[in-house]
Amino acid sequence: PELDLRPREAITQRLVEDLTEGRLDAALVALPVSEPGLTEYPLFEEEFILVRPQSDADKPVPNPETLREMRLLLLEEGHCFREQAISFCKLGSALPRDLMEGSSLTTLVQMVGAGIGVTLIPQMAVGIETRSAAVSVARLPAPRPSRMIGLVWRKTNPLGSQLAQIAELIRTS
């Protein structure tokens, strides 16, 4: 079938607003979004990956408690990935001892490459974001932090059945 894809990136809150107001047909987001007017279709689990300076490649991988004591580089407030990373470190309302913010994953990874700190990024971003930086990547110890990625659309969307078929194709591939 003909499909006119027009991808765009935005924070989850804006995507949800655009969905509910009819400006978007569907969005790939971290679940749950808990919006009653939206259908959520879980697609896959995505792991968080630690990015640290290349010089730390041979050091033990830190656990959440150790991460709290390191200079942690996170996305600015409003990004759901920031909240998910803080939740993994079990920081609650307390921020890491030494926190710095960046506006994008690219900025955070370049800051890590410059030796400023460490960060967590989604597994699907590792290949692109780390290819030109002097960094090492590592899986965190179990239980590994992750999030569910899903396709979301308005329950009233006339394309709902087609979107469910697309979601199932993504999920099974």
Annotate each PLM feature:
Residues R52, L75-E76, P96-D98, I121-P122:
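Thr-Gly-centered strand-to-loop micro-motif
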Residues Q13, S55, H79, T106, ...:
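Alpha-helix/helix-capping structural signal
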Residues P7, L28, E40, L50-V51, ...:
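Generic preference for hydrophobic
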Residues E17-D18, P42, E65-T66, F88, ...:
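Well-formed, non-transmembrane alpha-helical positions, independent of function
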Residues E35-L73, E77:
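Flexible hinge/capping segments at coil-to-helix
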Residues P1-P36, L95, E101-G102:
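Central regulatory/effector-binding core of bacterial HTH transcription factors
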Residues S34-E46, P60-P62, T106-T156:
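Beta-alpha-beta core module
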Residues D58, P62, M70-G92, L159-A167, ...:
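Secondary-structure junction motif
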